[in-house]
Amino acid sequence: MPKHNKLLGAFGEAYAARWLATRGYIIITRNWRRATGEIDIIAQQDDTIVFVEVKTLRCTSYADLAIIVGKRKQKRICETAKHFLASAREYNHMCARFDVIVLRSDPFRRQDVDIVHLPHAFEDLV
């Protein structure tokens, strides 16, 4: 992955975590990795554990939102979420939810950030 894309992704994930925190979410961890994949943000909202995939794009149409996180990626996120829950049993009593946050911005051109939060973006596919 080109360095520019990594920086753009890191910017988006940090921005999304701050955005969620200002809305009352408790950020549990970021960039949680296992062999099955990575979850960008794991947060808590009331009695729900929220697994968040963040996509930062320089340009896209909102008509494309349905294909931004494909079925294969969704499955990897779900598998990784199960590993998280197995290793962090204190969250097992909570409901789980999979969200997607899409940011449209190019911080290298000092563009404003346009954010779309899609709660319940997909269901557990495993």
Curated annotation (Swiss-Prot):
InterPro entries assigned: Restrct_endonuc-II-like, tRNA_endonuc-like_dom_sf, UPF0102_YraN-like
Alphabetical list of Pfam families matching this protein: UPF0102
Gene3D superfamilies assigned to the protein according to its UniProt record, in alphabetical order: 3.40.1350.10
An MF annotation (GO) of this entry: nucleic acid binding
Highest taxon listed in the record's lineage: Bacteria
CDD domains cross-referenced by the UniProt entry: PoNe_Nuclease
HAMAP family assigned to the protein according to its UniProt record, in alphabetical order: UPF0102
Family: Belongs to the UPF0102 family.
Protein name: UPF0102 protein TP_0913
Species this chain originates from: Treponema pallidum (strain Nichols)
